[in-house]
Amino acid sequence: MKLQKSELPALLERIYSEVTPLYGVGKTADYIPPLSRVNPRQFGMAIRFVDGDEFTVGQASTPFSIQSISKLFALMLALDIVGDDLWKRVGREPSGMRFNSLLQLENENGIPRNPFINAGAIVVTDTIVNHSASPVKRLEQFMASLSGNVFNRYDPEVYVAEARTGYRNAAIANLLKALGNLEGEVDVVLDSYYKQCSMTMSCLDLARATESLANKGKSSFRTQFHGERMDKRVNALMLTCGLYDAAGNFAYQVGLPAKSGVGGGIVAVLPGYFSVAVWSPELDSYGNSVLGQKALELLTHYTSSSIF
């Protein structure tokens, strides 16, 4: 990485000044009412190095709805619980179709392509539900153990909106059940899934929570962690499947494993160096933050950092 840490504060300010003119290019997620009401003119960014040094700019400490970024933490927890047995129920390939496709799920006998599309994430949540007395609390505690912030919780208003508008997710869960790949009760699994997607965290929380993915599974906040080289496996899935239908273009433009959510957040890691989280609510047509993607592209450009 061609940059001294002492130069990072100035670089982050430069990135901030270069991305904020993009306000208005995208739009907030209008199909989840609480997200549509978020002030769109916000941007935050936080970087955490594997030695614990942190740098931030903008609204890096502002909590927001992490949405599909929660699928990353649910995956890590499910793998912590059942290990490679999870892959008997969900694949590890890009889908090539919409993240909430029913057609692909039925054509492939109820085995979702990967854990980041909705069908795969629901199977992951089902795994947690079937191994936990209180699955939502267990996930909250797991995420708190990664971020060091015990106040990360789901947002009740967002949860209610998710549940009221989640018709397609209900269809996916029922199809999974019909095809024999949902062990729990549909309503119970969906309730946990909606609460999971409604979790709130800040950029700083997310950068800390993904530190282990940049540091060979080692976390500053958690003494025991997931299995051998979990970071390698999860990072591979983020690179190929982490940004909906734009994963290939993001790998080309940015060159880091990453996971996004329609709340406007993106987490990314440069293994051996740092984890980074960005947030800005306005999305492109693929559901990814316009300013967030540009900020990460500028970061890797100015620091000559990439996994490639």
From Swiss-Prot:
**Gene3D superfamilies linked to this entry:** DD-peptidase/beta-lactamase superfamily
Pfam families associated with the record: Glutaminase
Per its record, the protein catalyses:
L-glutamine + H2O = L-glutamate + NH4(+)
At which positions is substrate bound? S68, N118, E162, N169, Y193, Y244, V262
What SUPFAM superfamilies does its record include? beta-lactamase/transpeptidase-like
Keyword list (alphabetical) reads: Hydrolase
GO biological process assignments = glutamate biosynthetic process; glutamine catabolic process
Q: EC number(s) on record?
A: 3.5.1.2
The molecular function GO annotations come to: glutaminase activity
State the InterPro entries in the record: Beta-lactam/transpept-like, Glutaminase
In its keyword annotation, does this UniProt entry include Hydrolase? yes
Q: Assembly and interactions? A: Homotetramer.
The family this protein is said to belong to: Belongs to the glutaminase family.
PANTHER family attached to this UniProt entry = GLUTAMINASE
Protein name according to UniProt: Glutaminase
Q: Please give the organism.
A: Hahella chejuensis (strain KCTC 2396)
**Gene from which this protein is expressed:** glsA
